[in-house]
Amino acid sequence: MKLIIIEGGDRVGKDTLVKNLQEYFVDKDVSLMIKHWGFPQGKTNEEKTAYQKEQFRNEFVRFNTLRDVKEMVVIWNRSHIGEMVYGPLYRGSDPKSWVISLEEEFRFDKDPEIYLIYLKADPEFLAVNDDGRSFSNKIVDKQQELRFFREAYESSKIMKKLMIKVNKQNEYIESTRILDEVIQFVTQS
C-alpha cells in the first residue's frame, strides 16, 4: 500500500492535486481511499487539541490495519504534519513531540511506501490569492505559517519527502506539471 500525504497552507493546490491523483489512479488496478482532515472540534483550545490527537491516532490505527493491502493507495489531504503548524499558531499547543511519536510508533519512519508531498508558495502570492477562508491574509502571518510548515516538513520522520513550489512569480504552475512530478516521485522512488 502507498500512503500519499499532501500538505501545505491554504491556496497551494492541495485539493486540485488530490483530484488529479484520484483521476490518475482510477485507471490503475488499485483501491483508492481519500481522507480530508478538517477543522478540529471542541470549544476550548485544549478540547480541540485533544480531538486532533484522538483523530490522528485513530486514523493511524486504521491505516495500520490496511498496511498489508498491496493494491491500495491512500491519500491524506492534510495530516498530522499540519498540526505542527496550526496547533502552535492558533491553539497555543506544542504537538511536535506527540506527532513525531505517532510517526515512530506506527513506523512511518521506516516505511518506504509513505510519501510526504509539501506544496508551498511565496507568502506574497498566498496573501494575494487568499480566498477569505484562511486564518489570515497578512504576508507576515503567511511567512510564519510557511516557516512552521518547513520546520514540520523537516521534523517529520517520513523517509520519502518531496517539496514543490506551486507558483512562479504571480502565476500558479500548471497543475499537470505538479501532478507529473508527484506521480514520478511515488512510482519510481
Residue ranges and their predicted role:
Residues 69-74, 113-115:
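Loop/turn-to-beta-strand initiation segments
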Residues 132-189:
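NTP-dependent small-molecule kinase module
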Residues 6:
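Hydrophobic anchor at the beta1->P-loop junction of P-loop NTPases
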Residues 12, 16-72:
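Conserved substrate/cofactor phosphate-moiety recognition/catalytic segment
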Residues 9:
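P-loop (Walker A) phosphate-binding loop of NTP-binding proteins
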Residues 86, 90-154:
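A glycine- and Lys/Arg-enriched "phosphate-lid" helix/loop adjacent to the NTP-binding pocket
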Residues 36-51, 83-95, 135-137:
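Surface-exposed cleft-lining segments at the edges of enzyme active sites
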Residues 71-84:
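Conserved P-loop NTPase "ATPase switch" module shared by AAA+ and STAND
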